[in-house]
Amino acid sequence: MENKSNCIFRKANEQEVAKLTELSIAAFHTDYLVGGDELDGPPGYDDKRWHFDMQKGGHLYTFLVDNKIIGGAVIFIDKNSIYIGRIFVDPLYHRQGYGVAIMEAIESLDNTISSFHLDTPIKNIRTNAFYKKLGYIETSRDTECVNYKKIK
């Protein structure tokens, strides 16, 4: 990524839900290429209604570069922490720093919050390495997922 000044991360609007759903599907389907058992994703990843509900609840975010939607996130904010439900980037923009930019934007949303939590599938080598690179520490795991936490 050459220039962060052309990037915008903000709450999604209703008109963006269809595009964000499309990008979510495309992004999560690439997980199949890095260890996923099938073309699949987290609950609701391929459901426009689910994304619409997340948007109405204020949890769906849009990531734009040069005013083009290239990714998004679903996050849940409380007074002390942020749970990162998922991030996704258009596969055409993978490995260009935009995932890092989204994570940095999330971590900068509210400077009073210093605790960030997320989980990712055990089998997804790419996302586990990505979150560790960003300073997230494994807190627990089960048969499906690894749970991570970061304190700023």
Where are these regions (language model features)?
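Conserved GNAT acetyl-CoA-binding A-motif
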Residues: M103, D110-I122
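Conserved acetyl-CoA pyrophosphate-binding loop and the N-cap/start of the following alpha-helix
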Residues: Y93, G97-A105
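A short helix-loop-beta-strand connector motif used in the catalytic cores of GNAT acetyltransferases and
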Residues: K48-T62
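Conserved beta-strand in the GNAT
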Residues: T62, K68-F76, Y83-F88
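Conserved GNAT-fold acetyl-CoA-binding loop/helix
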Residues: E22-W50
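A short beta-loop-alpha structural element at the N-terminal edge
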Residues: C7-E22
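Conserved active-site alpha-helix within GNAT-family acetyltransferase domains
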Residues: V100-A101, I122-R141
